[in-house]
Amino acid sequence: MSLPNTFSKEERLKSRKQIGLLFKNRQSVGSYPLRIFWAETEREASKYPVAISFSVSKRIFKQAVKRNRHKRLMLEVFRLHKHELYEKLNSETKQLNLMLIYVGKEPADFATIEKKYLKLMDKLFAQIAPQT
């Protein structure tokens, strides 16, 4: 079965409580210019195994247009490669909460973000695999 390349509202991490837990647990991996914070939680009423949020520093990119562009690029990379993530996370009871943060000081193009995202996912799975 093929997964649609969509990004639904239920896949977005919006809960302040869940986002707070991400930073409290401080589990993260990085591949410059991206860093990902992650936490495993019990799956609530969501049918998706992953909830994700995107962030770009206002301190680094002053203009909202530039911040939004980087968020859109990260969203697009996630959307195109989420089927790989979902295949590896086939748990019925656990959900993976992710916060993808752009930490670079200079603008990046889609190809760079995609390459670093894939490298980041390999690092993430290397850390998650021993725990499960």
What are these regions (language model features)?
Residues 1-132:
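Positively charged, solvent-exposed patches that mediate nucleic-acid binding
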